[in-house]
Amino acid sequence: MKGGRDLKAARGGADRPLAPAYAPCRPGRLQRHLLSGEFDQLRDFPIFESNFVQVTRFGEVANKVTMGVAASSPALELPDLLLLAGPDKENGHLQLLGLFPLQFVQLFVHDESRQQLKVKFRTGRAFYLQLRSPPETRDCEFGRWVRLLYRLRFHSPTCAVPFTHEDTAPEEEEEEEEEEEEEEVKEGQLQPPEFQATEARLDPQVSELWGL
């Protein structure tokens, strides 16, 4: 994170006592999809997921996205993987579009008032996601993402900070935007070239998981 600023307290309870990142609950769409048998090695991963709509930097809606974070081992205290899924264009069924090590991704709180997150790869490619959930649970659900953000920010054992607030200085943001390429969340565009040796785009028809 550039600028080294302290994270601001965010709406949704980021300053509350930390709860377990993966509270037991009814599996979401992504979890149920993984339980369907397509991806046997992901069946038992603890996953925290939400439904979003992808929006442009200016708030225009692009498409629907389900995003989740998962721990690749029960021994891990915090998640180390990011999963992205979306509806199949032909039948509308959920398909897994990509799985990425969190060390290669940054997740920002882009706009708290609109419950928007920003996902950015090290290549500079980025996209914006706005939480899509019932109004009566939206604040609580976004608050869980913020609390997870804080856990990852302050409990990370490495120097990498995968989750943080997007509160860089104006001149730094201008420089960042010049390097940033806004990304559309769809299959075929979710694999930053420099990570091809260490991560794999997951074809929903194939059960190969790059060694997990």
UniProtKB/Swiss-Prot annotation:
Composition-biased stretches (Acidic residues): 169-185
Function statement: RAB2B effector protein which promotes cytosolic DNA-induced innate immune responses. Regulates IFN responses against DNA viruses by regulating the CGAS-STING signaling axis.
GO biological process: cell morphogenesis; defense response to virus; flagellated sperm motility; innate immune response; penetration of zona pellucida; positive regulation of type I interferon production; single fertilization; spermatid development
Protein name as it appears in the record: Golgi-associated RAB2 interactor protein 5A
Pfam families assigned to the protein according to its UniProt record, in alphabetical order: GARIL_Rab2_bd (PF12480)
Residues in the signal sequence: none
Compartment annotation: Golgi apparatus
Record note on quaternary structure: Interacts (via N-terminus) with RAB2B (in GTP-bound form).
Tissues expressing the protein: Expressed in testis (at protein level).
Region (Disordered): 1-21, 162-212
GO cellular component: Golgi apparatus; sperm head
Keyword set, alphabetical order: Golgi apparatus
Keyword flag Secreted: no
Gene from which the chain derives: Garin5a
Family membership noted in the UniProt record: Belongs to the GARIN family.
